[in-house]
Regions:
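Enriched but not universal
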Residues: 1-12
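Short loop/turn segments immediately following the C-termini of beta-strands
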Residues: 22, 68, 116, 162
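A short beta-strand motif characteristic of beta-propeller blades
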Residues: 38-45, 86-93, 133-140, 180-187
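Beta-rich catalytic cores
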Residues: 50, 98, 144, 192
Length: 205
């Protein structure tokens, strides 16, 4: 298994650790305390195919998986100590293709996805009951999104993509969604953007 096909995310207080992976059940979560303690039971309804990305909501009450094959994203309630709840309904408007990256915004009200084909990113309002309305796609889209993240204050969203310019950044507003794409960096990354992250204070990318 290549490392970029195993994605992990820590839950509340780093007590739960999730990995999205190839091969059923596609998502695996462990209790973690000074090392691996035990594996949680798999969800009763699995993602439909290979898991590529995973993220917990900031409050640790939801977990979402980006994966291959429709519906491309699957999300569940999460309870520390007991694990997966019943799968949320799929979004009414699905992402355009296989999703490789996934991220909640810092306050847990938006869920963003990096897509490899048919557009490169999608974002949805997120509520306590699951997926809300899909935001309009940004006007300028790079090709083949691979990773996605929000700035610590939630006002920026950055996409790593396989093809030039390899990294793209947009303003983001909860009410209006994506703003106009920022200019590309004067010196581009040397190749495909497989991962992307802001520094803790949001001043570096």
């Amino acid at each position: 298994m290549r490392s970029h096909h195993l994605r992990a995310a820590a839950g509340d207080s780093a007590i739960d650790l999730a990995a999205a992976h190839y091969t059923s059940p596609y998502i695996t979560v462990y209790k973690f305390s000074s090392g691996f303690v035990s594996k949680y039971s798999d969800p009763s309804t699995l993602p439909t195919n290979n898991g590529i990305g995973v993220d917990f909501s900031p409050d640790g009450t939801h977990i979402a998986v980006a994966h291959v094959s429709s519906p491309y994203v699957t999300a569940y309630p999460w309870t520390k100590g007991s694990g997966f709840g019943t799968k949320y309904s799929d979004p009414s408007t699905l992402p355009g293709g296989n999703c490789l990256g996934i991220a909640f915004n810092p306050d847990g009200t938006v869920l963003a996805l990096a897509q490899y084909i048919n557009y490169s990113m999608s974002a949805y309002k997120w509520t306590s009951s699951g997926f809300g309305t899909k935001y309009a796609d940004p006007q300028t889209l790079p090709h083949s999104g691979h990773s996605i993240t929000f700035s610590p204050d939630g006002t920026l969203v950055a996409l790593g993509s396989v093809y030039s310019p390899y990294i793209t950044v947009y303003p983001f507003n909860f009410n209006t969604g994506f703003g106009t794409k920022y200019s590309d960096p004067s010196t581009l990354p040397a190749g495909g953007g497989r991962g992307v992250a802001f520094s803790p204070d949001g001043s570096d990318l």
